Amino acid sequence: LGILGVLPSKQVYAGLSNSTVVLFGGMFVIGAAMFKTGLAEAIGIAVVKKAGTNQVPLMAAIMLVTIVLSSVSSNTGTVACLMPVIIGICQAAKISPSKELMPLAIAANVGGTITMIGTPPNVIVTGALSAAGLPTFGFFEFAYIGIPLSIIIVLYTLFIGRHFVPDKQAGAMDEEAVKAAAEEAGASGDSAPKSKTKMWISGIILLGVVACMALGLKNLPLHTAAVTGAILCVVTGCLKEKEAYAGIDWVTIFLFAGMLSVASAMEKTGA
């Protein structure tokens, strides 16, 4: 559009400064800090191990912790983080991994419906409203549908769906192969000891940002809260600068920003 002269360069790149785009960028960094510090993995391990080795309680714990984590962070990252832990527990309990991994994947998908940044389609429809000059969805407005939907999915899976989950029996699994698969899916693969202090810091930052968004403070817009949290993640050492940049889903950022520019062009030309 800029090359063809439909829009001046200022308008072509204006979408990158849109408040919703900035909000996404900030939350991506905060989510990355959860995984890098090991907080997400620690939460997952604690909850899943607390459930024991009985198939149904284990399935319930897996789905609940996955829904919570995927609502404020990457669905793929959540699955990659929990997958090796779940496979290890399944092996120890003599449970088919497929019986727990399918609920893990389903929970990650449904958990993303709870917040505006939970899954790319939420981003796209929010972008469409913004591009049309209409009020956009609030950060938690998806939760009115997402939370009841999540509850229904969990209950259905526990009482009915689990009977239809394929029972893929497997022999001894190669731990290195499992780790490699998790890393390919998005896990950090960093086996270095994690700092509990940084875990606490990243958790407090996340809770603080989410609380500000839930309260809807007039003097602290959503995007300002998200960026402040992202900066704190770097300043406190939870993430290095390069890790913060790597944690941002740039495809989603440019998709959203690009839609705004296209909408501006259509409005200007009357298309």
Question: Which residues make up each language-model segment?
Answer:
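Hydrophobic alpha-helical membrane segments of integral membrane proteins
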Residues: 1, 75-82, 102-103, 114-118, ...
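Hydrophobic transmembrane alpha-helices of multi-pass small-molecule transporters
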Residues: 1-23, 29, 142-269
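Short polybasic/polar patches that bind polyanions
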Residues: 2, 35, 91, 115, ...
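Membrane-embedded alpha-helical core segments of multi-pass
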Residues: 4, 25-26, 64-65, 81-82, ...
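Membrane-embedded alpha-helical segments and adjacent helix-loop junctions characteristic
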Residues: 6-96, 247-271
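Residue-level recognition of transmembrane alpha-helices
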Residues: 25, 63, 84, 104-105, ...
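Transmembrane alpha-helix interface/packing and boundary motifs in multi-pass membrane proteins
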Residues: 65-74, 106-117, 211-218
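Juxtamembrane and boundary regions of transmembrane helices in multi-pass small-molecule transporters
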Residues: 93-106, 111-185
